[in-house]
Amino acid sequence: MLRNGNEGMSTIPGFSQIQFEGFCRFINQALAEELNKFPAIKDPDHEIAFQLFAKGYQLLEPSIKERDAVYESLTYSSELYVSARLIFGFDVQKQTISIGNIPIMNSLGTFIINGIYRIVINQILLSPGIYYRSELDHKGISIYTGTIISDWGGRSELAIDKKERIWARVSRKQKISILVLSSAMGSNLREILDNVSYPEIFLSFPNAKEKKRIESKEKAILEFYQQFACVGGDLVFSESLCEELQKKFFQQKCELGRIGRRNMNRRLNLDIPQNNTFLLPRDVLAATDHLIGMKFGTGILDDDDMNHLKNKRIRSVADLLQDQFGLALGRLQHAVQKTIRRVFIRQSKPTPQTLVTPTSTSILLITTYETFFGTYPLSQVFDQTNPLTQTVHGRKVSCLGPGGLTGRTSSFRSRDIHPSHYGRICPIDTSEGINVGLTGSLAIHARINHLWGSIESPFYEISAEKAKKKKSRQVVYLSPNRDEYYMIAAGNSLSLNQGIQEEQVVPARYRQEFLTIAWEQIHVRSIFPFQYFSIGGSLIPFIEHNDANRALMSSNMQRQAVPLSRSEKCIVGTGLERQTALDSGVSVIAEREGKILSTDSHKILLSSSGKTLSIPLVNHRRSNKNNCMHQKSRVPRGKSIKKGQILAEGAATVGGELALGKNVLVAYMPWEGYNFEDAVLISERLVYEDIYTSFHIRKYEIQTDTTSQGSAEKITKEIPHLEAHLLRNLDRNGVVRLGSWVETSDILVGKLTPQIASESSYIAEAGLLRAIFGLEVSTSKETSLKLPIGGRGRVIDVKWIQRDPLDIMVRVYILQKREIKVGDKVAGRHGNKGIISKILPRQDMPYLQDGTPVDMVFNPLGVPSRMNVGQIFESSLGLAGDLLKKHYRIAPFDERYEQEASRKLVFSELYEASKETKNPWVFEPEYPGKSRIFDGRTGDPFEQPVLIGKSYILKLIHQVDEKIHGRSTGPYSLVTQQPVRGRAKQGGQRVGEMEVWALEGFGVAHILQEILTYKSDHLIARQEILNATIWGKRIPNHEDPPESFRVLVRELRSLALELNHFLVSEKNFQVTREEV
């Protein structure tokens, strides 16, 4: 957080800062921590010792560029060099050796793994430590339990039963006496009684037999092992038994870590040193003491709130990468031990590098990381839909993943908003559906304390003494456990000056409660009007007038907006658009001042301090979401520029600001039922003038392989049996030419796969060749890459990737231009979404009093029930801004200045626009914001005045071109023999229970029979029906049941229920008991 000289002013931190800070901590600290844990590998028989040292490790610059890594499907990584020492007899060798490659974060805060941009999102978990809770059993008796959570996520419970005996539950099934556990951890009975506050309770429950079991540590360990492992018989104490117990129990359930040790000391008022990160007998006894105090009413009856952020910690990218590095070093240790054994078998002299160099050992590090990025739930494909998604994705926090919650079992309480989220986690921005409340987004000013894993929020410190001494106020970052001790003034006091504030009573937050107190009692106050919202929520103007559910939809839908070919910044915004675009990395920013020498579509040449710098531009590059990423130069040749100036703009940015949609003229009125149920009526102007036209790039690839007979596949233009029309775009190598326009079913890459013909298929000449010369006749199968349905477009790039002579991959990139059409989804910034239902000629659209036709018609019934009135304020103010040629940037919650501030602003601007343009219809006092408009078909005015305005409308990525789908025949499910589900699998349309009811209601028995049998899972009938249809024969009526019925019968048989069916003839409708 940077502070200006102005009092009460602060700048917003970099939105991608959290990812960069996490990765820097991994490189600077975590690598050294894990290398320090690497044990010395000794082989006493041969007097050899190998060791790695953390001091002075080095990371080389990546050997390839980012763009090459993406195109060639490689990992953008850096080689790690570490100091190593090898003692072989009396020979000591020291060497700096390479132990493998580590993926490197790029300037977007992402990683490139096998050519794909991936990002690691932050995980929020219960912090290690101890948590107490009380609950009532079925008899209404209070049961008190204490849960100890380890750093690995393992749980142990302390509980007091009805007989007032204290147990430790180390798993769901086994419970062990607290005395046995303490003795097994190294305490004798005398030490236990000396270190507890209630020794009489500890002495009351062990009988003579139990006292014998805890006479010594060895007996206690045996007893503990028997109960923990459920082993009977006589056991003998041994070192292997101790090691097994250490591995299965103590390592998993007793390692608290640095954070757990701090939490345990705080909760139980202990003073155990921070470097002692394991659970000690003293911890267990203090935890038991506290539990006894809760049970008998002598302690504080305070249940721990598991959903409070002070009891949570963030596992950032640093923690997750550190775990994987530790895992890779463990594998490296085993690999080096095997290599040492092989060295002695071959009797060769080893060096530190030769112990690590074998191929399998040197790639251990990078394969571990590639597996992690490919399979770990918190490693996600980077969302590159638009600049907003690129900025927001790295700020996500998730409760899901290993050690966390699950979408199906999480309670409402764990999903709900908590008072401790204020200024840390956005109360609005979360996913819809099963994961609602489990994935969130960090507030714009929140930062992560990487040392303790807590989320901190900034506040201004208010102190009368400090204010007198110096005019500036200090910004303090408070963690969730600290802000409980402060009186925090709410954001509505921001507008008041110091003199007025001292006389006022202000609303404040204290210990999760809201109070009204005098200004003198305030300790800290908020620093920003919307510091408790995420980036998505902060981009919604007039958010305070919207229902929270609609604001949630809006913040999600802004991330689905497609970058348009001609972007336009919003008339009404919140002021955060510039920072969001800047931190997304899509624009090119000058890193130093200088003079522009030349610009073109690929690069900008800049002269600075006597040097010429070449700044590359992104030119029609495909994103992960198939959008077109393109940068356009914004500086002319010869212009002098300063550091920080925008040189080129990326997709969906204009003038350095985020520009996701278009300002279009909208009317809220019904129109012939075409905007029923959220449908949207649009003007053909939006199509012909390319208002909502977007470009998309599809990637198609094909790879050559070696067949089972050892023959290599071949890329060629010479493909027999194919029409010349399909091959018209191929060059002499058999690959489509750059710039070609391709249609569905055209060949993009010609490929032949050799096949050995079977003897029965030989023609006479082939048999003769084989008999005389012994030559095998081979045939080739055409396996070319063809353009699928809906893929038509222009070829903009072709890439050959050849790793060896036989392994060739060809990638073809095709650019598509998509205008807006019926079936596309559009949305505003207030959760007002809809599907295009009809594109009307502009002369038929309703028009204003000055003759301007409306661009979009929304249903007015979508506003009152959804309670998203912000769209009305936005559209009216947008109209005023369009007429006055103004842009507005309004912070939310402007009612803190005065009542009805939003309404007053909108009406005053409309009145000014009416005066300026001399158009009285812009602001009519009888119905402000509304106007009389005319039907374009008849020229008659509509009966009621209609609300008109300029709204910022987005085109979303849910486009009809990617949704529409048809199937004639295709794959069937193996079990039910019904068509599979989904567009990607060329699946069928499901006719469910309710659809069958509808067809039954119309009495269409034959259609129903076709849908449920012939077209679906009647195996014999569906083969014969095609032939019958072609030849005009009668459709056969088969008597055997469809496959799904047979599956049902088998299911019942597996439950020991026999189900038979009999055909009753038309003549005799009765079946006797004997026949059955």
UniProtKB/Swiss-Prot annotation:
It catalyses: RNA(n) + a ribonucleoside 5'-triphosphate = RNA(n+1) + diphosphate. GO terms for cellular component: chloroplast; DNA-directed RNA polymerase complex; mitochondrion. It is an enzyme of class 2 (transferase). Keywords: Chloroplast, DNA-directed RNA polymerase, Nucleotidyltransferase, Plastid, Transcription, Transferase. It comes from the Eukaryota. Signal peptide: none annotated. It is found in: Plastid, Chloroplast. One of its GO terms (biological process) is DNA-templated transcription. CDD domains: RNA_pol_B_RPB2 (cd00653). Belongs to the RNA polymerase beta chain family. DNA-dependent RNA polymerase catalyzes the transcription of DNA into RNA using the four ribonucleoside triphosphates as substrates. In plastids the minimal PEP RNA polymerase catalytic core is composed of four subunits: alpha, beta, beta', and beta''. When a (nuclear-encoded) sigma factor is associated with the core the holoenzyme is formed, which can initiate transcription. This is DNA-directed RNA polymerase subunit beta. The gene is rpoB.
